[in-house]
Amino acid sequence: VSCNRNKLQKKGSVGLPIMHEQVKIKDPNEDGEGEICIKGPNVMLGYYNDPEATAEVFDDEGYFCTGDLGKLDSEGWLYITGRLKNLIILSNGKNVYPEEIELKISKIRGVEEVVVYQGESRSASDKEIIVAEIYPNFEMLKSDGVDDVQAYFDRQIREMNEEMVSYKKVGMVKIRDEEFAKNTSKKIVRFKIDKSVD
């Protein structure tokens, strides 16, 4: 779809669209972010003998809707910001991209793995709590003299929240004792995570 060239690169971008590739952003928000849709000779024609599945992923103009979220800047550089299926849409219409918050949290010392999601509560009046579930590097934290892992990460996340807009702030930190379940590509399987908060 796109690539950075040896002498033509932009930090954070996956590059300019390759020759003969058309890229558009479907239903962009106020920041220009939306679903990345592509059209070109390298795009599949559809799913074999499955017109319904094909119709689900192609729009009326023949663009393939990738399921990736991103934006194009004024010069046509493409940025990927997350996955559509991971997107958290709050009741006020604001979009929260978990991958953006996960990237910030992953830079905290002692974080081995992290997943951010919208917590599910049966009792809380505010059901829009953003949860950061962390699998820590327990050995590293132990060598750093951290006795209370929960308190350590609660403090780190509070500090991070001070730099975040209010609707993106993490409201709960969950610590897990084992790695997240992964698929054969070593990617975390998000749907297997218990998102309950009470």
Q: Over which residues does each language-model region extend?
A:
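A short, local hydrophobic-aromatic micro-motif
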Residues: 19, 34, 45, 112, ...
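Short glycine-biased active-site loop of nucleotidyltransferases that positions the nucleotide triphosphate
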Residues: 12, 123-126, 185
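Conserved C-terminal "lid"/linker of ANL adenylate-forming enzymes
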Residues: 113-118, 158-198
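AMP-binding/adenylate-forming catalytic core of the ANL superfamily
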Residues: 40, 45-46, 69-164
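Conserved AMP-binding/adenylate-forming
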Residues: 1-78, 84-87
